[in-house]
Amino acid sequence: MPISYRMLLILTLYIFELCRCVDASERPVVKTEEGVVEGIRLDAGGEKVDAFLGIPYATPPVGNLRFERPLPAKPWKGKYNASSKPAPCMQSDFPIYQDIVLDYTHSSEDCLYYNVWRPTRSCPDDTETCNAKLPVMVFIHGGGFQFGDSSLFLYDLSHLAVRSNIVTVSFNYRLNFFGFLTTETADMPGNMGMWDQVLFLKWINKNIAYFGGDPNEVTVAGHSAGGVSAGLLAASPATKGLLKRIIMQSGTPLSLLAGSTYYSPDKFYDVSRTLGCHNGQAKKKDLDLPKTIKCLKKLDARKIIRSLLRLNLGQRVFSPQEGDDFFPYDPLAMDTWKNVHVKEVFAGSNLNEGTGFLSYILKHHHDLADNLKVDYRATITAMLSLFADVPLVTGKRMVKAYFGGYEVKHEGQKVVELLSEMMGDIVFKCPTHLYSELMALQGLPSYRYLFAYRPSYSIFPKWFGVVHSEELPFALGSLIFSTDPTRTSIATDSLPRGFLGRSYTTNETAFMRQLMDTWGSFVSTGKPSIPLRDDEWPSYTKTRHDIVQLMPFNYTIRFDKSQDKCELYRPFMIRKGAGKQPRLRIVSPGIAASSGKPISPAVASGANRQPGNNVAMSLVACCLLMAMRHLFATIV
């Protein structure tokens, strides 16, 4: 019987509708406070994950909103297409290793976006709401507060979401000049990048339940500068009730902010002059701040980046500062950390954090390399005095702890290796040890790890060992995406063919799963797990410094051997009896946030800073900033 035109049309429409429905099933939909978002369904480790990518959480901080605290995103109508990752925040191109560079010409001021991943199985009905109430992990990327973005394949958290049955989230925050420039007055208090993080945690609290997450079970995790951020957020009065746990990977507040890193009272004056917003004839105290800020807001962002590259490192580094109502306390004061409002802490570092940094420094500072050859003891002692305000007598004791007495002689490579160990202790291991100890003193369950595995695909010399960032693709589950061109970002398009996609072993795949289980256990329960064994992860306490060393198929409980050396640095990283009252330097207009009293001119100008700490521990910041130069070289 011949098919009529009418029947054919009906059949065609039916098939079209069927195809459309099948297509729609691959586009999960969620209704948030701002509007409806439509994500995509992806494969991650053999399972399906719902990904919602590149969604705004704030109004673009452009024009008059540059240097201002972020405003919530405006509501939208219709469905927001959340199928691609966002552009990174404004930054310069990033040298990775030798002539290999990440191309950040596509970076933008319009960058305050987030990504969410959830296991598809947790919300099988494909409705606009999901009541799964899964634990949530919010990850903050590193980069010394100068570089980085959430779109790099390294931070693809989809595999971790399905493996651990949690909701994972990443996001961008303003960096460098755009995120941390400050006048140290109410005209431009600064810390915009940190207020971005605060606003996003508030967004999480209001919206993550729509994605199947539990707003009462939020873990904030971060690497390097992201770890510093997690620690600051845990004590900020602006985030109380917004997070329950923190994970700090190779970075704590004692790492980057120790001694007011790269602080200079003249930085705003100098930078605004470089950018042509005043001619330098007016004295700093006579500078018309509102007029200068208005000028800076009108400048082209890319022109700013190019101009700043002509300055030396100290002039163009902008980092979080204490003294506003985000962080009104002295970060080096022991009493500051009595204000922490999280329940559990998980922190750690890698076995050889200092090797990559020192190698880079020696390559670009031949005078230092030459001085080490002539007299390494005197050179290192002088560096400690210059960069960290360490008295010469104390500096000699520090050098002796690593190099032995004067009767012990070292040469060449051995000097470099011992100095690398010292730098790793100063920048990462000891800040992590001391911060974990401070948490334990507050009665918080605190857990420590030491990542001790050198990947088979490492491109560095063997003596480098296990360098900064090498745990990331294992712990975050992104190792499998290094060979997937669909998971890379625009920034990696400039990399030479073959740089990405290096092979990894089946044992490394298994190790990745073990670390994901450990991280996922902490996010879900507040305690990391030891795979393949019934042993419990020991707490890190004031009297018992147990850590777990991480190797494939071998998690070993051991005593933290670095604590004796860390005692040498304690007086420079933690000040007893200081900071009992908020040490306000910047406040909201006219009012001291903690007391309600008008701010004094001395406080407003930053006059309460200790002169001896203006450049204290800047070696720490220098090393952290250099870490990003080695990021991809150490993981791919």
Features from the language model and the residues they span:
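Non-catalytic accessory segments of hydrolases
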Residues: P2, Y14-M194, P215, P485-D517, ...
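C-terminal GPI-anchoring signal of eukaryotic secretory precursors
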Residues: S588-V620
